[in-house]
């Protein structure tokens, strides 16, 4: 999945039945693999693609803040990935296709889909880039992938941008470098038409095909779920839908080219995962793969000691748009949730602060934190940053010692609470979800 300004980059998930998924690691775990300094929420890592060939996994992606398109590889999905090799062909959303000992790269430089042959181990471009399809006329043709079936090369792309006009289109050719014939029934997946106007899923696009072990075909795509009005809370999420792909035919997604929150289809034999505790006790030697930092972190500021996570304060705030603050966080996975932490300031100077934040980017975040005061007292503070506006919503003096901070979320509001005894939480205020 895209990881933008967050480090480690490119979270990697695994499933044996396409239903139960678990994160098994991240592809980019070392600063030498990815530089995110100066990356905004719109920067960093875009749209990775993973491919397997002859015993090796390849991941190709784009660092739009630094060196553009690059590849890393591994023979062990649970281990470390290689150092990156850059590729010459530009654009975003690169993808790889392997056939006959050759590796082909497709991406979208110059607002069209282009193809070239490369060496995936060195990144060297072996042939000139060739324009192979412009799409169907929608803006931003991107996210290309090539599949071969029944001696046809199928070229799958996204068009229309990533909001409500998003769509998936497809073309095919007898030759990998074209010419490609557009599907007369394009788009094969979209929610821009009247038949999906009231669908709770919108902005559907950027798709991949996968064939399961039983021969069934599935499509994975990105979309968002609007909450109130045009606001969507969890960003672009990954959806899975059934697909029929008959011999020599065009693929048909879920019967009518739309998807739903519930779709009744035969499934693979289910292999549920062991239930994990929602609690993180910090008793391991390192943080789990789900924890991330803003940009490349400073490891010396993070220590796991006796079941506690010790964070060293730094002179970089959450408002900084270039450097890395002392921050460790998790992506919000659910509309309704509760997040609680027990914390204590130690060796703090006046104005030092630490706490919980609901963070979208450096200019949009809600902060619930404990602040050290000059008279050896401390305060629990609720503050927000929205664009150019920073405001302290509420501040309460509390005794020195451990403080419990809690954020409760739903589709409309985040509620911010604190406790000094670990049991009796007091609500400071609630903030609207639409602004972050």
Language model region names:
Residues 1-436:
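Carbohydrate-active catalytic/glycan-binding domains of CAZyme proteins
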């Amino acid at each position: 999945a895209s990881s933008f300004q967050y480090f480690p980059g490119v979270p990697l998930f695994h499933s044996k039945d396409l239903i139960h998924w678990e994160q098994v690691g991240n592809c980019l775990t070392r600063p030498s693999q990815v530089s995110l300094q100066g990356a905004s929420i719109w920067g960093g890592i875009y749209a990775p693609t993973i491919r397997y060939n002859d015993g090796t996994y390849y991941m190709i992606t784009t660092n739009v803040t630094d060196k553009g398109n690059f590849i890393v590889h591994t023979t062990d999905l649970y281990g470390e990935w290689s150092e990156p090799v850059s590729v010459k062909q530009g654009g975003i959303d690169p993808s790889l296709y392997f056939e006959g000992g050759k590796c082909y790269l497709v991406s979208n430089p110059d607002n069209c889909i282009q193809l070239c042959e490369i060496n995936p181990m060195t990144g060297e471009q072996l042939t000139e880039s060739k324009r192979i399809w412009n799409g169907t006329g929608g803006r931003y043709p991107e996210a290309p992938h090539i599949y071969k079936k029944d001696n046809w090369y199928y070229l799958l792309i996204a068009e229309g941008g990533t909001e409500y006009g998003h769509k998936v289109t497809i073309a095919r050719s007898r030759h990998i470098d074209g010419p490609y014939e557009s599907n007369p029934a394009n788009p094969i997946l979209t929610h821009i038409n009247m038949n999906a106007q009231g669908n709770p899923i919108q902005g559907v696009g950027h798709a991949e095909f996968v064939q399961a072990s039983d021969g069934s075909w599935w499509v994975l795509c990105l979309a968002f779920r609007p909450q109130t009005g045009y606001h969507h809370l969890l960003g672009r999420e990954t959806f899975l839908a059934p697909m029929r792909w008959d011999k020599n035919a065009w693929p048909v997604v879920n019967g009518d080219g739309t998807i739903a929150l519930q779709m009744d289809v035969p499934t693979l034999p289910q292999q549920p995962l062991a239930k994990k505790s929602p609690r993180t006790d910090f008793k391991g030697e390192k943080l789990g793969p789900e924890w991330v930092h803003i940009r490349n972190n400073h490891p010396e500021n993070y220590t796991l000691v006796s079941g506690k996570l010790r964070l060293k304060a730094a002179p970089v705030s959450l408002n900084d748009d270039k450097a890395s603050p002392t921050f460790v966080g998790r992506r919000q996975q659910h509309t309704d949730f509760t997040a609680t932490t027990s914390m204590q300031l130690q060796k703090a100077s006046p104005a030092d602060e630490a706490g919980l934040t609901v963070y979208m980017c450096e200019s949009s975040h809600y902060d619930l934190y404990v602040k050290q005061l000059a008279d050896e007292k401390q305060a629990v503070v609720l503050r927000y940053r929205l664009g150019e506006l920073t405001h302290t919503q509420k501040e309460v003096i509390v005794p020195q010692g451990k403080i419990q901070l809690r954020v409760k979320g739903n589709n409309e509001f985040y509620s911010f609470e604190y406790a000094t005894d670990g049991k009796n939480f007091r609500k400071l205020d609630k903030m609207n979800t639409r602004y972050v």
